């Protein structure tokens, strides 16, 4: 059968294969056509990296399927950066790159100034002067990119179902405003919302600053039942 292999440059290679071919065989065929050594090839299908010992059939790769070929850099590595819109950016980096370098690469690709970027990995915000290796960020790690709003900040609201909502707020916003934003996102009327921070229930007339709620703070949302106290 024929399958297609698409490279990052946009070139598409056609290969003749059998379902029983293993991924190593496929990489050898790509080497024959393109001269790329198998140890520098990574093949992706349906978002999964394909392992050498498995066959095309194992991954349900059928005729006319398209695989994506990503090059494994010698000494370098690829990492992924996921934005809040769900878009994933691929970056070529070295473990010795510092976070500032990474933000510069994101600016090159996406046009977002570094001072508006916040990068999160394993729940931690990454500091400019530190390196990827300092944070144990390895090949194929995924960082999360959050935009820093001028003058505003982001906070998180966690519901009892475990869902986390992100809100854009100002420290001067009062709790009523925050509940209105939650209503806009989730459709929950403010009179059914109870917001908790640091174990305290937040009162409508007070502001986020009154409770020392800062950027990236997490509030907990509890629903007030109709007819309840």
From Swiss-Prot:
Main localisation: cytoplasm
Keyword line: Cytoplasm, Isopeptide bond, Nucleus, Repeat, Ubl conjugation
Compartments where found: Cytoplasm; Nucleus
Cross-link Glycyl lysine isopeptide (Lys-Gly) (interchain with G-Cter in ubiquitin) placement: 48
Domain of life: Eukaryota
Record GO terms (molecular function): protein tag activity; ubiquitin protein ligase binding
Gene it is expressed from: ubqD
SMART domains: UBQ (SM00213)
Residues excised as propeptide: 229
Alphabetized InterPro entries for the sequence: Ubiquitin-like_dom (IPR000626), Ubiquitin-like_domsf (IPR029071), Ubiquitin_CS (IPR019954), Ubiquitin_dom (IPR019956), Ubiquitin_ubiquitin-like (IPR050158)
Further comment: Ubiquitin is synthesized as a polyubiquitin precursor with exact head to tail repeats. Some ubiquitin genes contain a single copy of ubiquitin fused to a ribosomal protein. In D.discoideum there are 9 genes: ubqA: 5 copies of Ub and a final Asn; ubqB: 1 copy of Ub and ribosomal protein eL40; ubqC: 1 copy of Ub and ribosomal protein eS31; ubqD: 3 copies of Ub and a final Leu; ubqF: 7 copies of Ub and a final Asn; ubqG: 5 copies of Ub and a final Leu; ubqH: 5 copies of Ub and a final Asn; ubqI: 4 copies of Ub and a final Asn; ubqJ: 4 copies of Ub and a final Asn.
UniProt KW Nucleus keyword: yes
Keyword Oxidoreductase: no
Any one of the GO CC terms: cytoplasm
Gene Ontology BP terms: modification-dependent protein catabolic process; protein ubiquitination
Protein name, as recorded: Polyubiquitin-D
Source lineage: Eukaryota, Amoebozoa, Evosea, Eumycetozoa, Dictyostelia
Role description: Ubiquitin exists either covalently attached to another protein, or free (unanchored). When covalently bound, it is conjugated to target proteins via an isopeptide bond either as a monomer (monoubiquitin), a polymer linked via different Lys residues of the ubiquitin (polyubiquitin chains) or a linear polymer linked via the initiator Met of the ubiquitin (linear polyubiquitin chains). Polyubiquitin chains, when attached to a target protein, have different functions depending on the Lys residue of the ubiquitin that is linked: Lys-48-linked is involved in protein degradation via the proteasome.
Domain spans labelled Ubiquitin-like: 1-76, 77-152, 153-228
Glycyl lysine isopeptide (Gly-Lys) (interchain with K-? in acceptor proteins) cross-link site: 76
PANTHER family: UBIQUITIN (PTHR10666)
Entry similarity comment: Belongs to the ubiquitin family.
